[in-house]
C-alpha cells in the first residue's frame, strides 16, 4: 500500500517516515534485487513510488545514480551544484577523488536554511539519515528537479 502524496514536499514526508531504517532491505527488495546492493538511488526511487511519481513519469525508477542524473538532464530538469535547491529535489553527489564519471550518491532535499542544504539520504552509513551541507558545496554535482504540475 502506497503512501499517496500530491506535492514534491510529500516525497520529503515519505523520506522523513523512514529515518533510522538500516540495511535497505525493504527498498532493494522492492526494486527487485535478491540481496543487498548500494541503495541510495533505490531509496529515492522508493520514496518517489510511494507518491505515485514513478507511474506518473515525474521521477525515474533508478538504481544507479548516473541513470538518475542523465534522466533529469535529458529533460532539462537539472540545476548545477552551485544552485540553491528547494525541498523535494534530488541532490546528487560526486565525491572528491571518485572514479565515477557521473555521480556517486543521491539524497532528497528536506529543507534549505541559512545557506545550508538539509537532506535525507538512504544508504548513508547503511541507514536512512539526515545530513547537511553548505549551499554550493563542492561535492554536490547538482539537483534533479521533479515537475509535479
Model regions: which residues?
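Solvent-exposed, flexible loop/coil residues
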Residues: 23, 31-32, 66, 73-76, ...
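N-terminal capping segments
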Residues: 1-56
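Generic alpha-helical secondary structure signal
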Residues: 6-13, 66, 70, 83, ...
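A generic structural signal for ordered secondary structure
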Residues: 18, 104-106, 130, 140
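Compositionally biased, intrinsically disordered low-complexity segments
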Residues: 3-6, 17, 72, 109, ...
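...with weaker cross-activation on analogous glycine-rich loops/strands in unrelated enzymes
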Residues: 54-126
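Active-site signature of cysteine proteases
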Residues: 114-149
